[in-house]
Amino acid sequence: PERAGLGGALGDIGTHAFHLASYVSGLAIERLAADLQSFGDGRALDDNAHVLLQYEGGARGMLWCSQVAPGHENGLRLRLFGDKGGLDWQQEQPNVLRYTRHGEATRLITRNGAGSDAASAAASRVPAGHPEGYIEAFANIYSDAAALIRAAQGKGEKPDAVLPGIEDGVEGVAFVDACVRSARSNGAFVALRR
């Protein structure tokens, strides 16, 4: 804890799931309730976490992050359900987004495939059907960051980039802090300190 901070799996991988859910939904978390566990002998920090989320406007969510789940290799998964339908995306199958409108059959939307929009095309580096994902996502971030730096130096136009900022980092720290406070209060709901 002296070097890693308050969160184990929560700080390592949970913050990414938290940020992804907030970014994709466009919603901010108001309160959460967390149950943190450590299954490894002698571990001071969590290696498994279950978190109930209450978003602004009444939306609800659940987050599970674990570093002790055999058979799941960085199994980041995001599911969103609303009044119009649902979305389901898994990092282990990153080129496919499952989209289901209420009362209709599920559609599989492929990365940069038919019906993709301009944002999808801009983020894709190879044609549809070729594997692409994790490393290319970092390349997109670095490329956008470099373009923003060049623009700030007057050496180009400011790109239409979507990058995480300091606010996202602060929000991630507030998320870990709230989870630890909740767990220490027997899983009581607590507000994020912003």
Residue ranges: model-predicted function:
Residues 1-43, 49-53, 97, 122, ...:
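Predominantly a Rossmann-like dinucleotide-binding segment in NAD(P)-dependent oxidoreductases
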Residues 8-11, 15-19, 136-143, 167-177:
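A structural signal for well-ordered alpha-helical segments within the folded catalytic domains
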Residues 143-194:
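C-terminal helix-rich "cap/oligomerization" subdomain common to oxidoreductases
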Residues 5-10, 127-134, 158-166:
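Active-site rim elements
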Residues 36-46, 56-140:
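NAD(P)-dinucleotide binding in Rossmann-like oxidoreductases
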Residues 1-2, 121-129, 150-157:
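Short glycine/proline-rich turn/loop motifs
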